[in-house]
Amino acid sequence: MSTDRRTAGILKKFFNLEVMAVQIYRTQVGALADPAERSMMVSAMKNEEHHRETFRSFLRARGISPSPQWPIYWLVGQVLGRITSLFGRRAVLRGDIAFEDKAAREYSAFLREGAFTEQERAFIGEFLEDEKKHSANWRNLL
């Protein structure tokens, strides 16, 4: 499948952002004392892992390697998760709302810009809704 540079770049960025999201959640779980809230965060993390692996499969299907910068996104996710965790539950939730809202804006913008297959477009639309749902969940906990 032929891929224009813009679409390839968007898919790589989506993958990188999902790598970061997984690490943010992974490092924040311990900051939540309530078992139900921790369970929600683990569920969100697993959802982001699904997004990451789906983007990995889209890249593979197009014969594209992930960006060599993905380890930087992994590290940034670790740092953001740990920093927000240092400031407690409210900081974790506020940070996650900001992260998820930004992800939703990027998904919306990239959907308009990329030349995606119908399958990719459907998944990306579903992932956009997931990001909005995560943000709403964290808002409800504040």
Identify the residue ranges that each predicted region occupies.
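Non-heme di-metal
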Residues: 1-142
